[in-house]
A protein has these predicted regions:
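Fe-S ferredoxin-like electron-transfer domains
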Residues: 1-112, 117-143, 161
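Catalytic alpha/large subunits of respiratory electron-transfer oxidoreductases
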Residues: 13, 70, 131-311
Length: 311
């Protein structure tokens, strides 16, 4: 095993052996497991040490000088994401991972799902947040708040600051994969424009005023009562966002029906999911998904609609 690792460590910079900036470098870890402390082949032959780092993607960098051409990223893009944005170009010492047709990542078909970054055993593909903030010190399992799919993530943190969001391997809804939003676009949680305190205003022309939660809730309740007294109980309704969890959506409809006394409740997810929701409801009695990815492996029959599995 040591001899197998030796050629791999002759490709990236030799500083990889003692280097710990990436924190999860599999190549470095396996070198330690096999007892490899120095390489025999050196850097006299062809290599990629003078390759220019691709920083075109806003979320991660691609440093070809650290690549061992293991093909993991290519397979992740093909087999996990299904985008086929990466390939191995060249032959022999000229072999390298190529986005598109030797293009920068942002000019290729890459959708920034992060599957290649997660699969990379070195620091060739690395999150920019890790480079800027350093290595995470602890983590916590959480759920993505972007939509109702419920993808599970491991929030890796340094103190109280999120360093990166990694798709959780045991996530029932995503199984260690995610889209660009959950994987990289979580900065809204700490964005300077995010409202962190309750605010009220008497009219649209008045400035917002920061108040306590009790004052905000009492003001909202009094205004709802005033509107219903003037325009009737059907004058108020509730619409939930597709970012809401099932529990939050349930509470909104309960508030509208129990407190406001009407059925004026809806969710924006109904518009795009109404056909599938109706079909599932008629067939299974519920409009929500009833299976996990694991259950597909045990299915006797799989019906695929609107796709070309042979492509």
């Amino acid at each position: 095993r040591t001899r197998v690792m030796d050629p791999h460590l002759s490709v990236p910079p030799l500083a990889c052996l003692p280097f710990s900036a990436t924190g999860n470098c599999e190549l470095q870890y396996m070198a330690g497991v096999t007892g490899l402390r120095e390489v025999r082949y050196g850097l006299a032959g062809a290599n990629h040490l003078k390759s220019t780092k691709d920083e075109s993607n806003p979320y991660f960098t691609y440093d070809a000088s650290k690549c061992i051409v293991c093909n993991r990223c290519v397979r992740a893009c093909e087999e996990t994401q299904g985008t086929f944005a990466l390939t191995i170009s060249g032959r022999g010492f000229e072999s390298r991972v190529s986005p598109g047709q030797d293009q920068p990542f942002m000019d290729s078909e890459c959708v920034s799902c992060g599957a290649c970054v997660e699969a990379c055993p070195t620091a060739t593909l690395q999150e920019k947040t890790v480079i800027m903030l350093g290595q995470p010190e602890h983590s916590k399992i959480t759920t993505c708040a972007y939509c109702g799919v419920g993808c599970a993530f491991k929030a890796e943190m340094k103190g109280n600051e999120v360093v990166r969001m990694v798709p959780w391997k045991d996530g029932k809804a995503n199984e260690c994969h995610a889209c660009i939003k959950g994987r990289f676009a979580w900065g809204y949680a700490t964005h300077k424009d995010r409202m962190t305190e309750p605010m009220i205003r008497k009219s649209i022309h008045d400035p917002w005023q920061v108040v306590s939660w009790d004052e905000a809730i009492n003001y909202a309740a009094s205004e709802f009562r005033r509107i219903q007294a003037k325009h009737g109980k059907d004058s108020i309704g509730g619409i939930t966002s597709s970012r809401c969890t099932n529990e939050e959506t349930y509470l909104v409809q309960k508030l509208v029906r129990a407190a406001f006394g009407n059925n004026n409740v809806d969710t924006c997810a109904r518009v795009c999911h109404s056909p599938t929701g109706y079909g599932l409801g008629q067939t299974y009695g519920t409009s929500a998904g009833t299976q996990t990815f694991k259950s597909v492996e045990k299915a006797d029959v799989i019906l695929v609609i609107g796709a070309n599995p042979s492509a």
